[in-house]
């Protein structure tokens, strides 16, 4: 039985993780959980249902209320609380389903304590890929990706020798603005952007999908996750979102993972690997006609892919800067302070002006993060 610490239990990934735990109670047990979002009612419902040994909350008012409602449960507060949850003796696997880099210290400490990591958080590897990879290697920790694309690549690479691999290929739906012309892109609204044709995601991720920044982040993530320095990592547009990742080998063969666009599939495999359990969702129905289309990324429309590749070339502080600057610009767009086109225009300007420097510690990463946020707010 795997004993889980779930960070971000009320978010989309967290809720589906608990759905799998609910389906397989003999395989998984929730030891601790944290929610730093606003859905306090749902979090309390989760605490009642799964009765973890401990939980963490984000402020003192919520902490006091939680302690009163659950007097026999241990509660922790703030960022330090995340670390306490993750390093509990009985925890075997940390499910990092929260967004942002707030959970980075907790994740690093959990790996030092020998905890397995199921990772849904793009920012952790984008900002601290070198540090996380080094910590995982030193402590013999295998990082199991939850993102559908990286989970697909992980499955394609299982049992393969590095020498035979030529390319890692991430697929992108193209987002809600795929078929709009360059002229139309200049006047898209927030509602246009948030109406994703395939995936039901949070606002920030949906905006990232529209700019393809999410795919840029995933290219960086794949580099650190798989450690294949001499292997090309690229993205292609695949509007149907049925194939999630592909590996091309030196002999020209391509292996892919295919399933309906539902995050439950990769979440479940990240939790059960290398075993496979029955899914509550229907798989592919090949009795019906299926269409698979692939298009190259138009870099004039989506400079985010080029920016991500430059991050990998420069490394150092560039990943943290790229991630933080984008977060602020997306927030400004959602607040209707800037246009959709401004996101990529301003992000490109910021990245061109950033002078890359070495970034080896958690303190370095947080310093870059703060610098980028301040500049992105002003530009």
Curated annotation (Swiss-Prot):
Q: What class of enzyme is it?
A: oxidoreductase
Mind telling me which Gene3D superfamilies this protein's record contains?
1.10.1740.10, NAD(P)-binding Rossmann-like Domain (3.40.50.720)
Quick one: signal sequence residues? none
Q: Name one GO molecular function term.
A: manganese ion binding
Q: Which cofactor does it need?
A: Mg(2+); Mn(2+)
Task: List the catalysed reactions.
Answer: 2-C-methyl-D-erythritol 4-phosphate + NADP(+) = 1-deoxy-D-xylulose 5-phosphate + NADPH + H(+)
Q: Where does NADPH bind?
A: 10-13, 39, 121, 123, 202
Identify the residues that bind 1-deoxy-D-xylulose 5-phosphate: 122, 148-149, 173, 196, 209, 214-215, 218
Q: Key word NADP present in the record? A: yes
Q: What GO terms describe the biological role, i.e. biological process, of this protein?
A: isopentenyl diphosphate biosynthetic process, methylerythritol 4-phosphate pathway involved in terpenoid biosynthetic process
The residues listed in the UniProt record as binding Mn(2+), with positions renumbered to this chain, are 147, 149, 218
Pathway it works in: Isoprenoid biosynthesis; isopentenyl diphosphate biosynthesis via DXP pathway; isopentenyl diphosphate from 1-deoxy-D-xylulose 5-phosphate: step 1/6
Alphabetically list the UniProt keywords: Isoprene biosynthesis, Manganese, Metal-binding, NADP, Oxidoreductase
Pfam families given in the database record: DXP_redisom_C, DXP_reductoisom, DXPR_C
The EC number(s) given in the record are 1.1.1.267
The record lists the membrane-crossing segments as: none
The protein's job, in short, is: Catalyzes the NADPH-dependent rearrangement and reduction of 1-deoxy-D-xylulose-5-phosphate (DXP) to 2-C-methyl-D-erythritol 4-phosphate (MEP).
The family line of this record is:
Belongs to the DXR family.
The protein's matches in HAMAP family, at most eight in alphabetical order, are given as: DXP_reductoisom (MF_00183)
| Protein name in the entry | 1-deoxy-D-xylulose 5-phosphate reductoisomerase
């Amino acid at each position: 039985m795997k004993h889980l610490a779930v960070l971000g239990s009320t978010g989309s990934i967290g809720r589906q993780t608990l759905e799998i735990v609910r389906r397989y109670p003999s395989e998984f047990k929730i030891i601790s959980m944290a929610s730093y979002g606003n859905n306090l009612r749902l979090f309390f419902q989760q605490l009642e249902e799964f009765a973890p040994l401990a939980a963490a909350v984000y402020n003192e008012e919520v902490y006091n209320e939680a302690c009163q409602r659950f007097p026999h449960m241990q509660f922790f507060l703030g960022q330090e609380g995340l670390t306490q949850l993750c390093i509990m003796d009985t925890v075997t696997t940390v499910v990092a389903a929260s967004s942002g880099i707030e959970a980075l210290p907790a994740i690093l400490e959990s790996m030092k304590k020998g905890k397995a990591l199921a990772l849904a958080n793009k920012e952790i590897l984008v900002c601290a890929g070198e540090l996380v990879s080094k910590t995982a290697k030193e402590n013999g920790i295998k990082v199991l990706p939850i993102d559908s694309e990286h989970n697909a690549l992980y499955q394609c690479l299982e049992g393969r020798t590095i020498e035979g691999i030529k390319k890692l290929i991430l697929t992108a739906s193209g987002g809600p603005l795929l078929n709009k012309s360059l002229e139309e892109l200049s006047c898209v609204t927030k509602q246009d952007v948030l109406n994703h044709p395939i995936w039901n995601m949070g606002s920030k991720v949906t905006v990232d999908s529209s700019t393809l920044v999410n795919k840029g982040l995933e290219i960086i993530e794949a580099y650190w996750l798989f450690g294949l320095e001499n292997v090309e990592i690229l993205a292609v547009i695949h509007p149907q979102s049925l194939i999630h990742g592909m590996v091309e080998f030196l002999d020209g063969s391509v292996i892919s993972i295919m399933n309906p666009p539902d995050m439950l599939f990769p979440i479940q495999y990240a939790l059960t690997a290398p075993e496979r359990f029955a899914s509550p969702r229907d798989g592919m129905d090949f009795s019906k006609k299926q269409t698979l289309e692939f298009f190259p990324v138009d870099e004039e429309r989506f400079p985010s892919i080029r920016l991500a590749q430059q991050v990998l070339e420069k490394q150092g502080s560039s990943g943290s800067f790229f991630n933080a600057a984008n977060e602020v610009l997306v927030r400004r767009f959602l607040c209707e302070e800037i246009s959709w086109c401004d996101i990529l225009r301003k992000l490109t300007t910021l990245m061109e002006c950033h002078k890359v420097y070495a970034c080896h510690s958690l303190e370095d990463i947080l310093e870059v993060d703060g610098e980028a946020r301040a500049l992105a707010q002003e530009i």
